[in-house]
UniProtKB/Swiss-Prot annotation:
One of its GO terms (molecular function) is neuropeptide hormone activity. GO terms for cellular component: extracellular region. The keyword Secreted applies. This is Periviscerokinin-1. Found in the abdominal ganglia and perisympathetic organs. Not detected in the thoracic ganglia, subesophageal ganglion, corpora cardiaca, corpora allata, hypocerebral ganglion or frontal ganglion. It comes from Locusta migratoria (Migratory locust). GO terms for biological process: neuropeptide signaling pathway. It is found in: Secreted. Keywords: Amidation, Neuropeptide, Secreted.
Amino acid sequence: AAGLFQFPRV
């Protein structure tokens, strides 16, 4: 699931 990790989790 690359589309899930295109934004950083901070």
